[in-house]
Amino acid sequence: NKKIYYPQLGTNLGLSPIECSRVAGEMYNELSPILDQYDAFISPTNNLPAVKADVDLEKDPVIINGKEQVGRDMCWTMCYPFNMLGRLPVLSVPSGFASNGVPTGIQIVARSYADEIVFQAGFNYEKLDPWLKNVENRPKI
């Protein structure tokens, strides 16, 4: 099973490391002014409720909105843009369970180097819905 890391994705598409950095810079230039206007950006961590742990991004199909998607461009994960832009603090927080029982999560993103904002937002979210305090929600061991 071949592992692919985010920096390699761009070079696998024929982009040089400099071009990959340029694209990341353009992404940051688009997103940064938006994040400066708000305390946090909140989104799901995945577009799907369940993805196999051993999914091969190169060849395993995933169904999104009823359509089979194959390849690294299928965009089921919402984390990679923020992983590419390492200056933005991101915190993943459990958000409950999908209809099939799989745990779901949200990610909280803040402006550059505002780590305290994501921690405070995550803390406040979990105070509102402390789902792990409910024994029924805990994993069976």
Please describe what each predicted stretch is.
Residues 1-32, 48-49, 53-54, 94-102:
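Short helix-loop capping/hinge segments that flank enzyme active sites or metal/cofactor-binding pockets
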Residues 118-141:
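Short, gly/Ser/Thr-rich active-site loops of penicillin-recognizing serine hydrolases
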Residues 19, 51-76:
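Short, surface-exposed loop/helix-turn segments at secondary-structure junctions
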Residues 102-111, 118-122:
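Short, well-ordered beta-strand elements
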Residues 30-33, 69-93:
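Small-aliphatic-rich amphipathic alpha-helix that forms the alpha element of a beta-alpha
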Residues 45:
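Glycine-rich, N-terminal phosphate-binding loop of Rossmann-like dinucleotide-binding domains
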